[in-house]
């Protein structure tokens, strides 16, 4: 927030569980109250859990489904209701993953949720296009974040197997989203923009 304000922007923060419909509704209402309207939506909340398929537990799956699917679905639904009333169109981006496109060891459950996000965006083209709202996904591959860098081998491993020689940065992912939210992408909808340095083209497993 400090960075946004320091660079001339404005923002509001709503803290809560992204899988809680009450929180989702309050977030959307806060945006309307603070800024007057909603033009752009990014559904970025998500969690990753690794696990052997044969050992995966119901509690872990429910948590994945709640955050990755329930939260994204109802954020888009609530925001789209506002955008529909405004009658001014808009753009929506959902965060997917390369695991929604391609099999990955130990990520069967996570990949399932991200494939569902991909299909959600495609299906919502039917509902949102008549309203002038486009909806797309960004599917990151290996990305350098505070969490991924906790693995001391992450950078070297993914640099070795990524055709472009390095993982993505957070900025790489953000700029892909900015493009899909921009007027330059106004006739793009129902698509997935994969940002993975070419990894899915060759599909070399890190394991």
Question: Over which residues does each language-model region extend?
Answer:
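Residue(s) in the substrate-gating loop at a strand-loop-helix junction
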Residues: 97
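Active-site loop immediately N-terminal to the catalytic Tyr-X3-Lys motif
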Residues: 53-54, 102-108, 130, 165, ...
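Active-site helix of classical SDR
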Residues: 76, 113, 121
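Substrate-binding pocket helix/loop in short-chain dehydrogenase/reductase
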Residues: 52-53, 60-65, 158
């Amino acid at each position: 927030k400090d960075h946004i304000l320091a660079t001339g922007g404005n923002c509001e923060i709503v803290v809560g569980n992204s899988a809680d419909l009450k929180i989702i509704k309050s977030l959307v209402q806060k945006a309307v109250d603070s800024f007057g309207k909603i033009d752009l939506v990014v559904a970025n909340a998500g969690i990753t859990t690794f696990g052997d398929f044969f050992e995966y537990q119901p509690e872990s799956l429910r948590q994945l489904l709640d955050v990755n699917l329930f939260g994204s679905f109802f954020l888009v639904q609530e925001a789209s209701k506002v955008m529909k009333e405004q009658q001014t169109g808009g753009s929506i981006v959902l965060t997917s993953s390369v695991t929604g496109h391609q099999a990955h060891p130990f990520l069967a459950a996570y990949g399932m949720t991200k494939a569902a996000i991909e299909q959600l965006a495609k299906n919502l083209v039917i509902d949102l296009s008549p309203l002038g709202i486009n909806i797309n996904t960004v599917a990151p591959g290996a990305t350098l974040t505070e969490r991924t860098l906790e693995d001391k081998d992450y950078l070297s491993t993914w640099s070795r197997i990524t055709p472009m020689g390095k993982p993505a940065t957070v900025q790489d992912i953000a700029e892909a989203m900015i493009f899909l939210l921009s007027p330059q992408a106004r006739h793009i909808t129902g698509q997935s923009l994969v940002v993975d340095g070419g990894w899915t083209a060759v599909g070399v497993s890190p394991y």
